[in-house]
């Protein structure tokens, strides 16, 4: 009787490691798009005190009129962050915005998601370099 019960449990025990491997593989496949994301961001800040940020809708209209596709525009810590689908669109937008806002605003590229952003997401304390 014990051999019969052991034979019934063997297929389950053999199946469990394969289910775990399949689960880990599915999680890995779900994470691939986040690892190979190529979006690019620009940050607009006021270059001196007393200058207010430009309206996000105005920036959107201006860049759209130039044929530049924008993923999103969000205000973040006294700045305006604009996300684009590709670095080419980001550089084209930078040229347009530098002409438009001349000396009033600082326009800079933000670094893409790297190790520091992953560490900050899982850490209790933010990590800073420099």
UniProtKB/Swiss-Prot annotation:
Keywords: Cell inner membrane, Cell membrane, Membrane, Transmembrane, Transmembrane helix. The keyword Transmembrane helix applies. One of its GO terms (cellular component) is plasma membrane. The lineage of its organism: Bacteria, Pseudomonadati, Pseudomonadota, Gammaproteobacteria, Enterobacterales. The chain crosses the membrane at residues 16-36. HAMAP family: Modulator_MzrA. Signal peptide: none annotated. It is found in: Cell inner membrane. Residues 1-15 are cytoplasmic. Coiled coil: none annotated. This is Modulator protein MzrA. Residues 37-130 are periplasmic. Modulates the activity of the EnvZ/OmpR two-component regulatory system, probably by directly modulating EnvZ enzymatic activity and increasing stability of phosphorylated OmpR. Its main location: membrane. Interacts with EnvZ. One of its GO terms (molecular function) is protein kinase binding. It is a single-pass membrane protein. It comes from the Bacteria. Belongs to the MzrA family. It holds the Pfam family SecD-TM1.
